[in-house]
Amino acid sequence: MTNNTYTLNEVVVTTDWLSQHSADSNLRVFDCTTHLIHQSNPESDAPYVVQSGKDDYDKAHIPGAAFIDLQQDLSDTTSPYRFTCLQANELADKLGALGIGDNTTAVLYSQTTPQWATRIWWLLRTVGFDRA
């Protein structure tokens, strides 16, 4: 017998919850969409290129949401490896600039696969933020 009950329901919100809390001054909603585009370039070592989801965000997003560009805003762009985590103090500063603070509740979503919102959720956890 399997138990299909989701046990971490405090980290997932419903559209009803979001609608009820959309006017909360401490709520920040972020579109975290990123695309990995497969490339068949024999000259490149990378099997894919990273493409920001900003164009998708510009076309449509949850009202009041802001956009987080994972690769450009929250990753070490000097690293030879994609999506390398920033140093904790730099990451905290970047998150603060996005309006994420001690009393903030952050809702993260991706328009494609959930891994991008999940990645940013984990980054928030690395600096001790647990209200996402």
Predicted segments — roles?
Residues 1-132:
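Cytosolic catalytic domains that perform sulfur/thiol-centered chemistry
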